[in-house]
Amino acid sequence: MDYPKMDYFLDVESAHRLLDVESAQRFFYSQGAQARRATLLLPPTLMAASSEDDIDRRPIRRVRSKSDTPYLAEARISFNLGAAEEVERLAAMRSDSLVPGTHTPPIRRRSKFANLGRIFKPWKWRKKKSEKFKHTSAALERKISMRQSREELIKRGVLKEIYDKDGELSISNEDDSLTNGQSLSSSQLSLPALSEMEPVPMPRDPCSYEVLQASDIMDGPDPGAPVKLPCLPVKLSPPLPPKKVLICMPVGGPELSLASYAAQKSSQQAVAQHHHTVLPSQMQHQLQYGSHGQHLPSSTGTLPMHPSGCRMIDELNKTLAMTMQRLESSEQRVPCSTSYHSSGLHSSDGVTKAGPLGLPEIRQVPTVVIECDDNKENVPHEPDYEDSSCLYAREEEEEEEDEDDDASLYTSSLAMKVCRKDSLAIKLSNRPSKRELEEKNILPRQTDEERLELRQQIGTKLTRRLSQRPTAEELEQRNILKPRNEQEEQEEKREIKRRLTRKLSQRPTVEELRERKILIRFSDYVEVADAQDYDRRADKPWTRLTAADKAAIRKELNEFKSTEMEVHELSRHLTRFHRP
């Protein structure tokens, strides 16, 4: 049945016209949200009277559904109501009780488990989780939006630009993003390509160095002559903490053996010099030959370092340094010698080792990038140059803390073991000496004479105690020790033997005991008779005995008692014969 939509008041006459009492009740309960929106003013008895004077207009207070949002329906209707009576009716409807009439439906009882919904609300758990994810994603988006571009960081002075002779610039970070001994391993090493641009005129000062490419070194005018590295235009400033050494590893392919060597001694000596060069022949050997003397193609492409690879680089660096230390102790290798000439710094060739075919096996020695920290603040920030980012630019300080926390998870077990050993050594070295303990009155101060006196005192105490013990004679006098002779002891033993033999010899035999009616075994008391075998579970023959059989058994037993055993006169009446 299609009912009309009820938005406002429904008076009695229209209700009478629509349907009878039962269908009206069904209609009001079936219309969920629509019936709630309307303020229903039905009398308790619809059949009572039809005139408006006799109509009872008490409000029927309906129970609100829990799924309905609270007081929205009443608020919506209250805009359409002008009188104060209707508002009071709305307030009366908010209570959960029904005013029962003659034809109103029965009051809905709440179940026993209705209060459980107040405690356990599993439908809200998923909402909480989704809110949590929303909060975290919003925070991440805010952090990402707050990240500044590399150009802004250059303007602020967080990053500095390093210009080569060729006009290309590479950016190094002032933070400790790449510290001593860090290797940059990628499929292609990012190195500046040769161009015919004129270098900017620069004063000769302490500078930061970049590793030139193997092709640049080989194609030079004199392959044997040392190549000078470009310098930064900087001013002289007072000396600052020691230089950072950045290690760039050239990677030729999967067959290239990756080995890193931290050339700290050579870098520390190189700090004092203003102009340094690298031998091109050594660079050729390093970049062109693999582990087994294979020719490797030199790659000239540039590849930027991503922030995600920085942590892996740190870990690679640690493990490579550890493996190099192990190799140094196990293998015989040619030491990396550093010699200074008038032209500048020379680095030794790769460590050679005989291969399987007799060919010299060449290990990779890492090329070193020396970064001068003397004039960090005086570096010019010019955005006109093209930049090829060789090194990784670090984020702001907030992200640094997060990365430090994550990097702590990557520490190897070997490093933890070394830390434990170091801490143990520190604890042992911090143990106080005997003199310190004596000064703090923890150990008493004693000379050799005092120790001898103490020993003598202890010895006299012991001898006095031993001398105070009673002698054997005193114990005999007190009857604690009894004097014993061997003859007396032997006589006592003989006496014991005689006593035992006499007892054994005087024991009567079994026959004598039977004659005296002193029986030893149970079989001597009972005459054994053969009995028929029967099933002890199923067959029970004594249940089949009649009264005459029982009387005969009793008579036989009493006769045996009267003949075999003497019965006392007072108990003879108990042995009388039973008549069958």
From Swiss-Prot:
The modification Phosphoserine is found at residues 67, 78, 467, 505. Changing residue 580 to A: No effect on PPP1CA-binding. It comes from the Eukaryota. Pfam families: RPEL. RPEL repeats lie at residues 138-163, 422-447, 460-485, 498-523. A motif (Nuclear localization signal) lies at residues 108-129. Interacts (via RPEL repeats) with ACTA1 and PPP1CA; ACTA1 and PPP1CA compete for the same binding site. This is Phosphatase and actin regulator 1. It comes from Rattus norvegicus (Rat). The gene is Phactr1.
